[in-house]
């Protein structure tokens, strides 16, 4: 009996040891895999120099993905297909995904223009990839007028069907993708801001390009500083009017609510909520906008911002704009507002309020039949 017990004990010890060994083996595998995974993440991110804050040359550029080709391009501005293909060879390329009625995109343009002026002769090529948000933004003439208005001289391609957008798996306006001179995507940034970081990447990649091509040049290490274009996140978010755009972001304050493709009679309630817009009059609910059909109509919006813009179109009639119930003075008037009114015709962004300082106010728009509004945006 004692022998049997002894044998059983020895057997149990062997089994426990085996289980422990197997557990240790798999734990070791898990740690090895985790270590390898972390190493891959570190390599993908690329090392940094903590002293200077500047990115260090990546040891194996082939681990970065190669940028997709520009596909499905409907038209070209400031270039031709042949010229652009030739220009892209051996260049550091910054792809800027934008659309001309997007205020966030527009606020990025001064930096792109400054970088183009500063680094184009050092090997930087900026390509504006115009991927429209609204149907009217597909019109090449509208994009050409916007490029002229904002003084854009670098190549712009019209990605009207979002084929290049999809090739990059992009989902944002604006979005920047920067490739080295071999075509690898080395940096991405979505939205506004972090301009210093983006410019440091440009400088680093230009220096790497010069070394690789045996060029005796170094990128200017100073940074573009455009304080007037710095973005403040403490403000009312962009507000959409089309029912297709309001999913999960419906800021219509009227109790009548959205009624797709119907003409709805709206009445402004007594209590107004911040960052919500309220309608008065008869408005047609469209997929990307709302259109006034009654003789008179009104939009009231309590907001927090310095600047107020609308993406709108109309028949050329004037809208009247009030700020906190009063006619807008010259101190608060936007670029498109004169004597408290603005003529609305072309599909575009209109700047109606531009105050000296950011604050909380209520803007009122009084409009006439044919006025069509897509978004409120703020700055």
Model-flagged regions — what are they?
Residues 106-149, 160-165:
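Structural microenvironment flanking redox-active thiols in thiol-disulfide oxidoreductases
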Residues 141-179, 310:
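Short, internal strand/loop/helix patches
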Residues 2-76, 81-82, 196-379:
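Non-globular targeting/processing and membrane-anchoring segments
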Residues 82-106, 112, 125-127:
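Short active-site neighborhood of thiol/selenol oxidoreductases, capturing the structured segment around
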Residues 81-82, 106-108, 138-140, 167-169, ...:
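Short, solvent-exposed loop/turn and secondary-structure capping segments
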